[in-house]
Amino acid sequence: MADCIFCKIIAGEIPSSKVYEDEKVLAFLDISQVTPGHTLVVPKEHFRNVLDMDADSTSQLFARVPDIARKVMKATGAAGMNIINNNEEIAGQTVFHTHVHLAPRYSCLLYTSDAADE
């Protein structure tokens, strides 16, 4: 899709910090880091979101997510990982090319409601 920023990243027209790449997916650091190491995993074929994907394409994407998430956790020293997929604007999707967010979580960034009140 000509005006899709993720398609342009996949085509090499826009630079990215690649984390993983194979024939089906590309994973790269999100330009708007929620936490250090925040990575996006995108299929190389353009789909608006998961709701538009066929079963095989969905399987190809999600089969790679755990391995990429483990590699990001190892590289960043994260204690955990949020794995998130938003579908449509009402659900928080802002780029309309299917993508999965890998947001590493760190114990040093934890706080409780008690700590927030101080």
Would you name each region that the model predicts?
Residues G37, L109-L110:
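Short acidic/His/Gly/Ser-rich catalytic and metal-binding motifs that mark active-site loops
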Residues V50-T76:
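Helix-adjacent hinge/juxtasegments
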Residues Y111-A116:
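Conserved small/polar residues in nucleotide/adenosyl-binding loops
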Residues G77-E88:
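A short glycine-rich, hydrophobically flanked beta-strand micro-motif that places a catalytic Asp/Glu
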Residues K44, N87-I90, V95-R105:
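Histidine-centered catalytic micro-motifs
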